[in-house]
Amino acid sequence: MVESKNTELSQGTWLNKPKSVFQEAGKVTLETDEKTDFWRETFYGFTRDSGHFLGVETGSAFTAQVRVQGSYESLYDQAGIMVRIDDGHWLKAGIEISDGHAMLSSVLTNGKSDWSTAVYGGNARDFWLRVTVEKGVLRIQVSSDKKTWPLVRLAPFPTSDHYLVGPMACTPERGGLKVTFSEWSLTAPLGKALHDLS
């Protein structure tokens, strides 16, 4: 179960709160600071934990969902959702600029980071993300209309009695990415079959 007293974004805790951020009921609008990122070691050799993350504490199993509206421009501009245990165990997923295109991107970190990208056929400037964690499995889904939710990634994920989950944004090469997060929900796991896209 969610096992959380406070499931609203307003009850979240910032990791690296951006200098420019506005929070109102059910909505967070921010502008990223210079050279912010989440990454651990792989390929590049560096570790960065400077990205913006608004984490809402939850229990051992949950489904979280959020709408993401962003004005991506430069290499590695990214915004989406993050699930985090600590600085060495986390997942971030969303839209990221790579090779001149807005890609559907996910990074799973278990000591070291991996990175997976795919072409996104919807509107990269306005989309929804859903993440479910239950019994050591993490499932990410994306939607362009909040009705159909194809799978982005299914992966093992460390079990924990609690997680932090919420909006994430980074700009490793610059600052100034403007993003609005809204339509946030945090509930018990939806319990849908893997190929149930509703």
From Swiss-Prot:
Induction: By calcium shortage, copper deficiency (via MAC1) and the presence of galactose (via GAL4). Keywords: Cytoplasm. It is found in: Cytoplasm. One of its GO terms (cellular component) is cytoplasm. It comes from the Eukaryota. Its main location: cytoplasm. PANTHER family: REGULATION OF ENOLASE PROTEIN 1 (PTHR35332:SF2). Functions in the galactose metabolic pathway via the GAL83 protein and that it may control the level of ENO1. Present with 721 molecules/cell in log phase SD medium. This is Regulation of enolase protein 1.
